[in-house]
A protein has these predicted regions:
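Nucleotide 5′-phosphate-binding alpha/beta core
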Residues: 1-75, 80-98, 102-106, 110-112
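AMP-binding/adenylate-forming
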Residues: 90-102, 114-162
C-alpha cells in the first residue's frame, strides 16, 4: 500500500484528536501505544475494534463528538447481544449522504433517475441513507420502506422507478 505524506499527516491529525478527546477510540490507541504513524506499515499497529468492544460501549460510549453536536442516533438490531449505538453529527449525516450519492453514481444513476427506497427506516441506517444519497444526487425519491409487495410493484410501474 502506498500512502502520501499528506495522508499520513491527516491520519496523525485524527489520531491526536482521538487521543486528546480520551474517548473510546482514544483509549484504544493509548492501550496499543499508538500516538502517530510514519508509514503504511504502521497501520498494522492500529488497534482493532471487535464486536464486543462496540457492545461494551453501550449506550453512548462510541460518541466521539460533544453531545450537543449529535443530531442522530442509529443502532444495530441487537439480536445477538446489546445493540451497537452509533451517534452521528451533522457532518457525519452529510458525509453518509455523499457516500451513498457516489454509490449511485458508480452504478450509473443520475438526477434523471427515480429511485424507490425499499430498505427499512428507523434505527437501522439503510433506508434513510439510501434516501439521503438519492436526494443528494438530485434524483426523484419514492421512500417506500420494506414490505407491502403489491404497493411496491404498483409504485414501480406507476412511477417508473429505475
Amino acid at each position: 500500500m502506498q500512502i502520501s505524506s499528506n495522508q499520513i499527516a491527516q491520519v496523525n491529525q485524527q489520531i491526536q484528536a482521538l487521543l486528546n478527546a480520551n474517548n473510546f477510540y482514544g483509549k484504544k490507541l493509548k492501550e496499543a501505544g499508538v500516538s502517530s504513524i510514519q508509514s503504511a506499515e504502521d497501520f498494522e499497529n492500529l488497534p482493532f475494534s471487535e464486536k464486543n468492544d462496540l457492545r461494551n460501549a453501550y449506550p453512548l460510549g462510541l460518541m466521539t463528538a460533544p453531545e450537543e453536536k449529535i443530531v442522530r442516533i442509529h443502532s444495530s438490531s441487537g439480536t445477538t447481544g446489546l445493540p451497537v449505538i452509533i451517534p452521528y453529527t451533522a457532518k457525519d449525516v452529510d458525509d453518509w449522504a455523499i457516500m451513498f450519492k457516489r454509490c449511485y453514481e458508480m452504478a450509473g444513476m443520475t438526477n434523471m433517475d427515480r429511485i424507490q427506497i425499499t430498505p427499512g427506516y428507523g434505527l437501522w441506517t439503510a433506508g434513510i441513507g439510501f434516501q439521503a444519497g438519492a436526494e443528494k444526487l438530485g434524483a426523484m425519491v419514492v421512500p417506500m420502506g420494506p414490505g407491502n409487495t403489491d404497493k411496491q410493484l404498483q409504485m414501480m410501474m406507476d412511477m417508473k422507478t429505475t
